[in-house]
Amino acid sequence: MKLQSLLVSAAVLTSLTENVNAWSPNNSYVPANVTCDDDINLVREASGLSDNETEWLKKRDAYTKEALHSFLNRATSNFSDTSLLSTLFGSNSSNMPKIAVACSGGGYRAMLSGAGMLAAMDNRTDGANEHGLGGLLQGATYLAGLSGGNWLTSTLAWNNWTSVQAIVDNTTESNSIWDISHSILTPDGINIFKTGSRWDDISDDVQDKKDAGFNISLADVWGRALAYNFWPSLHRGGVGYTWSTLREADVFKNGEMPFPITVADGRYPGTTVINLNATLFEFNPFEMGSWDPTLNAFTDVKYLGTNVTNGKPVNKGQCIAGFDNTGFITATSSTLFNQFLLRLNSTDLPSFIANLATDFLEDLSDNSDDIAIYAPNPFKEANFLQKNATSSIIESEYLFLVDGGEDNQNIPLVPLLQKERELDVIFALDNSADTDDYWPDGASLVNTYQRQFGSQGLNLSFPYVPDVNTFVNLGLNKKPTFFGCDARNLTDLEYIPPLIVYIPNSRHSFNGNQSTFKMSYSDSERLGMIKNGFEAATMGNFTDDSDFLGCVGCAIIRRKQQNLNATLPSECSQCFTNYCWNGTIDSRSVSGVGNDDYSSSASLSASAAAASASASASASASASASGSSTHKKNAGNALVNYSNLNTNTFIGVLSVISAVFGLI
């Protein structure tokens, strides 16, 4: 893989920075009052896609049609019969395949390895068209990220849809994106003055937010610190840069990029257990909310922070803007890393300083301030709950969100599985650290499969997958594997789900199994991780299988081919033999699997566990695995009112952080 040519302009933020009206009203980290329509209602029922997303899709479809057609022409260029493409890309737009890419969590490992995987799919990457899947990303409708994967997707999207190629080409420039040669704790290395100054600024930003009357948490600190790595060209890391700003960027407005989605989990304050029935939230440029029965609602992301009752501002005609800080939302999806800040005693800080800071930080965690606080609750009294769902979210004054992988669904698949989004195939990029050696073992797929049989999976479908032992014993965690290849075997599910192209992190030219908590990478390590990710997504630049490009093409067209009852290209039959999981189970116990970065134990109740993959998916589509009888269980855990937040402790920790890094 080559990553040499500068393929896009270095001025990646030009169109975004011109749209200053979409930024925080104060051009600072502090949300502010703005006028809004007297009759505005900020909350809607999750009964379908938003009007904004629906209109945006019309623009995106025009781009994906051309890009995907071009990609499939190249992928099937050696096929004996490609007449199906004429049908798929003819006048009937409903015949065109619709695809998405989902990037897993896993810290900088997931960000960098995932970057290589995306680079392999991006026709702006040098060599991607010759040795990779170039053009696939241009043909994608949705791009979802979670935790470290969200760092990747948000970096690209909120830098005016820059490319991994451009980031790599500008590595040596000042204010380069992803300059992680030093830990986020000591961003300027031995330059104690710059490091101290940055932490002073972060402390001031978060303190100002509190002084304005908003709840704060460690996620505010984490988000401000992250932002300097992802938006270094903006003033103080985009201190006033908002999530909704992307709406005003031409590259998004015109549908020239995929629709970005990030994922977070709801958490009950005072607990550390997040299970598969936790309420799963998504953020996109227009909205945030949940499809789950325990909320079943979305709100306008631009006006987060507004005090509402059933979507109506309490103060008529008055809203809040600027709460949707891009760094804060990015941090919300990765609050696992608050635990990194809580591990200061394992860093190279002088012990007396580390101990002092740790005391404050542990108090902060004990008071549940180590989560992201969305207050006032944007869904207060918004009663769109589905039948028998608990109402604790809408009864609370606060909404508490945590890392999107804490339910052990470390690949953000659930938003993409929604029937309303009509996806045919999802490329699931798995850079999880499930094994003792920090490789994935398929657990994320297993957990999403299981979720459909729990209380939150009433309207969810996911293809059959094996247990994690089978993943490892059959080597499915070391090479791309397709799941749900034959729709005829999936009819017992709620609906026919997208075909899943699973692409796990695996070793090719570099040891990509770095610790999630490795918080600094040299330039050579960064490039090595990206290069290895490229190779993992392409079967070693096609050296391991020269037919892999064509097989990816087969996966993309499969759902539409079956829907139309059209003839499958003969070459696809061999592809599916090579890459589709055929239902084989090998559940012999494997040591060192089933681990993850999260302290919680994501599980369903015993009855739902009985529908687990290892028990039910032994033959491609056993009717006994449909789980139809388990779809009616009571709703699971959700958030409840929790108002006793210890902000005094937090003020102390801000001062300590600033002092600590001024003394390094």
Swiss-Prot record:
Its main location: membrane. Residues 635-664 form a propeptide. Glycans are attached at residues 26, 33, 52, 78, 92, 123, 160, 170, 215, 277, 307, 345, 388, 459, 489, 513, 541, 565, 582. Residues 35-586 form the PLA2c domain. Transmembrane segments: none annotated. It holds the Pfam family PLA2_B. One of its GO terms (cellular component) is periplasmic space. GO terms for biological process: glycerophospholipid catabolic process; glycerophospholipid metabolic process; phosphatidylcholine acyl-chain remodeling. Keywords: Cell membrane, Glycoprotein, GPI-anchor, Hydrolase, Lipid degradation, Lipid metabolism, Lipoprotein, Membrane, Signal. It is a lipid-anchor; GPI-anchor. It is found in: Cell membrane. A lipid is attached at N634 (GPI-anchor amidated asparagine). Its EC number is 3.1.1.5. Belongs to the lysophospholipase family. Sequentially removes both fatty acyl groups from diacylglycerophospholipids and therefore has both phospholipase B and lysophospholipase activities. It also displays transacylase activity. Substrate preference is phosphatidylserine > phosphatidylinositol >> phosphatidylcholine > phosphatidylethanolamine. The substrate specificity is pH- and ion-dependent. In contrast with activities observed at optimum pH 3.5, the order of substrate preference at pH 5.5 is phosphatidylcholine = phosphatidylethanolamine >> phosphatidylinositol. This is Lysophospholipase 1. It comes from Saccharomyces cerevisiae (strain ATCC 204508 / S288c). The gene is PLB1.
